[in-house]
Amino acid sequence: VNEWMQTGEAGIYAIGDIVAGYPQLAHSGSMSGIVAVTHIAGKPAKPVNKLRIPGCTYCEPQIGSVGLTEAKAKEAGHQVKVGKFPFTANSKASIIDNHEGFIKVVSDAKFGEILGVHIIGPVATELIAEAVAVMELEGTVEDLMFTVHAHPTVSEAMLDAFSAVEGKAINI
């Protein structure tokens, strides 16, 4: 398929698990369908960026990831900076007695571009959406470092993880 999910046959589109190269995840297929239908209707659409499709594992603790791992970023030639923040240092995670795991941010050392975010811990499958959104908007580590997060929330761990990239996490 092309970026609009069109096959080689005129007027035929394909989405979901049958499309090679796309993750076999409900949210991936759903967004591919939205892109296809929007394109069919002649409305403005934005293609799905396969690197920005979050992977989610619904277990305990939960796992959420998007983008490149540290190893893959280095293989791709990036100079990387990494920030890591443990949920044991997050107030809300302690309050709900669910503080196993951490958030790891992989960024480009020169420009602060967010290359990947990997989470294992409480509500990881929810938290990963913040990373996906900021990556889609081409936000930087600095952009997230200065985004106000409510307190006490598990999402504050995202703020601390991004701040940790620059050695400025306040809750460690």
Language-model features, listed with the residues they occupy:
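Flexible, glycine-rich terminal cap/loop adjacent to redox cofactors
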Residues: 41-42, 58-172
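Short beta-turn/strand-loop junction motif enriched in small, turn-promoting residues
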Residues: 21, 42-45, 50, 90
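Non-catalytic, surface-exposed connector residues within folded enzymatic/regulatory domains
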Residues: 27, 47-51, 67
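FAD-site-proximal beta/loop scaffold in flavoenzymes
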Residues: 1-42
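Solvent-exposed alpha-helices and their adjacent loops that cap or buttress functional pockets
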Residues: 6-7, 11, 49-50, 95-98, ...
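Flexible, acidic loop-helix segments that line cofactor/substrate-binding pockets
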Residues: 46-62
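Short beta-alpha connecting loops at secondary-structure transitions
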Residues: 17-20, 55, 143
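Short acidic-hydrophobic sequence patches enriched in Asp/Glu that either
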Residues: 28-32, 49, 123, 136
